[in-house]
Amino acid sequence: MNYEVVIPAAGQGKRMNAGKNKLFIEAKGIPVIIHTLKVFENHDACKRIILVINEQEFGEFNTLLKTYHFKTPIEMVPGGRERQQSVFAGIKAAGKEETVLVHDGARPFIKREYIEQLVEKAKETGAAIVAVPVKDTIKRVQDGEIAGTIERSSLWAAQTPQAFRLSILMNAHLEAEAKGFLGTDDASLVEEAGGTVAIIQGDYQNIKLTTPDDLLVAEAILEAEKRNEHV
């Protein structure tokens, strides 16, 4: 059940309009990246965290890690220009466990139960992701007009973590690099390489903090969690 997790944290999150790495933004007084890291710090099966960063932000990340006193080993690795390159750098630093997870630094609300289901499924099948069924009606648009309505019963929104047998993910990244293929997530690289990826149904609270509105939602979730602790 043990695993390592790669957390890409090098992006600047331009849609957040924060003027800095969005992972340094605080939610309830604690930086977003710390909320995310604590999820894995509090899970005994997580044996190592590989944090992929912008080299220019090494000092800021190093200070945060010292301030919040993590017991789980955390290795900082320099990332690339694209998220895919950053994840590739992260998995190159992995290898102590057979299973590796990839998780967005800006998704601090993944629950342990889904991580555990995901790791078990990945051990069984080689690759698995957390996802949720699409709730909204999806339109295909061309030149500013609706060109069709997509049947949503088979549509799922991919989230992270995404879990893989390390050899499968490494081979998928190597093939993508050789082809010049740039995927939208790591599962898409495995698909492109001819592999199959299983689905674990997660929940809609596992949001990625992308815009200022998402921070308001995050604050509300954290406030609700705090209240529940005292019930």
UniProtKB/Swiss-Prot annotation:
Top-level EC class as recorded in UniProt: transferase
Pfam families reported in the protein's UniProt record: IspD
GO BP annotation list: isopentenyl diphosphate biosynthetic process, methylerythritol 4-phosphate pathway
CDD domains per the UniProt record, alphabetical: CDP-ME_synthetase
Signal sequence annotation: none
Catalysed reactions listed for this entry: 2-C-methyl-D-erythritol 4-phosphate + CTP + H(+) = 4-CDP-2-C-methyl-D-erythritol + diphosphate
GO molecular function term, any single one: 2-C-methyl-D-erythritol 4-phosphate cytidylyltransferase activity
Keywords assigned by UniProt, alphabetized: Isoprene biosynthesis, Nucleotidyltransferase, Transferase
EC number: 2.7.7.60
Site (Positions MEP for the nucleophilic attack): R152, K208
Name by which UniProt lists this protein: 2-C-methyl-D-erythritol 4-phosphate cytidylyltransferase
Native organism: Bacillus licheniformis (strain ATCC 14580 / DSM 13 / JCM 2505 / CCUG 7422 / NBRC 12200 / NCIMB 9375 / NCTC 10341 / NRRL NRS-1264 / Gibson 46)
